[in-house]
Amino acid sequence: VENRRQFFRLEYPAKSGPRFLSGGVSYQVLDISEQGIKLGAHSTRGLKVGGKFAGSLTFTDGETFLVYGIVKRITDETVSIQLTKPIPCRIIMAEQRRIIQLFQKRA
């Protein structure tokens, strides 16, 4: 299977990702990249493919990043968002280091 993604995607182990809040609804963050975010879809009410999506992504260090994008895919379990404003690479790299350190301690 060919991986056609243009950007590194950081997958989060269960319950270790940042918090995403949109329209008063909190979503579990499954993975992030500079150009996209995948959320757990416990609620897709009001979402449609092609629709605009905005919210705040709050990382465990307290940094908050405002997210703007378009809903690209909705499944029974996930919502995929293509971002119109990229997440800075420095944030992705810091999160990658945090995940590595967190799980090295557990091993």
Regions found by a protein language model. Give the residues of each.
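Short beta-strand-centered aromatic/proline hotspots
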Residues: 26-29, 66-72
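C-terminal output/interaction extensions
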Residues: 79-107
